[in-house]
Amino acid sequence: MYVVDRGEGAPLILLHGFGVDHRLLLPLDPALAAAGEWRRLYFDLPGHGRSPMGGVASAEDLAEAVEAEIETRVGTEPFAIIGNSFGGMIARRIAHHRRGQVLGLAAIAPVMVAEHAKRRVPERTVIARDLRALAELGDVAGSYEEMAVVQTRENADAFLAHAHPGLTAADPAALERLARRYTLDAEPEIASPAPFTQPTLFVIGRQDHVVGYEDAWDRIEHYPRATFAVVDSAGHNLHLDQPGLVAALISEWLSRVRRSRSSKDRFA
């Protein structure tokens, strides 16, 4: 499995969404690097980017493959995990399965309900549109407009740098196979019903028409240490729509993870 490994310190696993690759999460790296003391491992999920699909045929298979790769790379060392969209669903599963090893969980626009028809989502909304910037995108404009809520030149440039390369690198046959078995065997909060007590962050776009925000809120009592932020003027790629705010929330979450770990070490 292809993984970009940056920095030194406690492992921080980053899992992207469906149909893109690790580059979609690289805009977070300056904030993560500034936080210090974190070894950032950006995964290309099987069938995405530079990772072959291999024998993965379902979301459950993919979660098991990612978990095995984590074990290979970090062993029994405690780690934190960030998941975006589909990667947020996988991150929740891993965080619950490895509770004793996971320092904290951050979910950016996570898939909470796998079946699209059962999700509660707002209507598609565009907050800002720069027609000149859209025209300059050419053939890419269609895929950009599908997700972008703040359609500015800066936002379009971020899409071209971080989202579009993964869209073109993905294996269409692999994605089709995975889409047929997109659900986990059980939702993590049901399979492991005890509250998840490590520092947690849910950050979701108010205008996210892909996963919405209501389904995540339904699980808030399961996460007693969670910050839950619904961000205006932000859609499914909210870290591109509102980069400064999302980076600040991630930085604050990492501070909570660090304090929680230090407290436990002190009283162990």
Language model region names:
Residues 2-52:
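Conserved HGGG/HGGXW glycine-rich cap/lid loop of the alpha/beta-hydrolase fold
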Residues 116-118, 136-194:
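Conserved alpha/beta-hydrolase catalytic His-Asp/Glu region
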